[in-house]
Curated annotation (Swiss-Prot):
The active site is at residue 95. Catalyzes the rearrangement of 1-deoxy-D-xylulose 5-phosphate (DXP) to produce the thiazole phosphate moiety of thiamine. Sulfur is provided by the thiocarboxylate moiety of the carrier protein ThiS. In vitro, sulfur can be provided by H(2)S. Its EC number is 2.8.1.10. Pathway: Cofactor biosynthesis; thiamine diphosphate biosynthesis. SUPFAM superfamilies: ThiG-like. This is Thiazole synthase. The gene is thiG. InterPro entries: Aldolase_TIM, Thiazole_synthase_ThiG, ThiG. The keyword Transferase applies. It comes from Coxiella burnetii (strain Dugway 5J108-111). It is found in: Cytoplasm. The lineage of its organism: Bacteria, Pseudomonadati, Pseudomonadota, Gammaproteobacteria, Legionellales.
Length: 259
């Protein structure tokens, strides 16, 4: 059991709702993974009438909605989108995304901090999508963000943890903040590695939605997240350069001599 934004949760896996072959398959994947938080784009919800079925399906799921500002590239766009999302979804949660480069989909750190500062003052619980840059994360925390969502690699790349050192440093430097890896994971083993490092949760979309079987993949990621977290809580042994016998030699009729 853990808490985020004043909400008690069991699952440490969050799922995005885009790119699935069908809305029903998305719903099945969410249920298979036992997910309790799903992200949704406000811009999709403001699209034509044909999307009403998708919205109705989202509302039928026993999940908390985390609207995002996907597609925004400026403070003004992001803040206005966040305000609209609060009215539409009746939540003060907002996943803040402000893209600075269309090729890498890397967030714009300067606009991100400015927008986060405004939204925190307006009472939002801001979930900023950011890089693993320590100084950027510190500025976001200084702005009032209690949650940080650094990427492991560029969105949709599936490359896994590209800068393990920087991510581990974030965990060490921000022990009281909730850290959720957002973007770049492609395999359940990536998620397990993140959780073993002490991160609080993982947000996925492409790795599940674009899998050959999204439902099975969602379930696999859920187990990996749980296993990784248990490994962290259990206290893993440190790696050694030499072997260490697990069977005691007390009472043995012989001794092992060094070569």
């Amino acid at each position: 059991m853990w808490a985020i934004g004043g909400v008690q949760l069991n699952s440490r896996l969050l799922l995005g709702t885009a790119q699935y072959p069908s809305p029903q398959l998305m719903s099945d994947a969410v249920k298979a993974a036992g997910v309790e938080i799903i992200t949704v784009s406000l811009r999709r919800q403001l699209s034509p009438q044909k999307e009403n079925y998708f919205w109705d399906l989202l509302r039928s799921l026993p999940c908390h909605l985390l609207p995002n500002t996907a597609g925004c590239s400026s403070v003004k766009e992001a803040v206005n989108t966040a305000r609209a999302a609060r009215e539409l979804f009746n939540t003060h949660w907002i996943k803040l995304e402000i893209i600075g480069d269309e090729y890498t989909l890397q967030p714009n750190p300067f606009e991100l901090v400015n927008a986060a500062t405004i939204l925190v003052k307006e009472g939002f619980e801001v979930f900023p999508y950011c890089t693993e840059d320590l100084i950027l994360c510190q500025r976001l925390v200084d702005a009032g963000c209690r949650v940080l969502m650094p990427w492991a690699a560029p969105i949709g790349s599936g490359r896994g943890l590209m800068n393990t050192y920087a991510l581990q440093l974030l965990r060490e430097r921000f022990p009281k903040n909730i850290l959720i890896i957002d973007a770049g994971l492609g395999r359940p083993s990536h998620a397990a590695q993140v959780m073993e490092m002490g991160f609080d949760a993982v947000l996925l979309n492409s790795a599940v939605a674009l899998a050959m079987d999204p439902v099975v993949m969602a379930a696999g990621f859920a187990k990996a997240v749980e296993g990784g977290r248990l490994g962290y809580e259990g206290g893993m042994i440190k790696a050694r350069n030499v072997a260490k016998a697990t069977t005691p030699l007390i009472g043995k009729p012989f001794l092992i001599e060094k070569p």
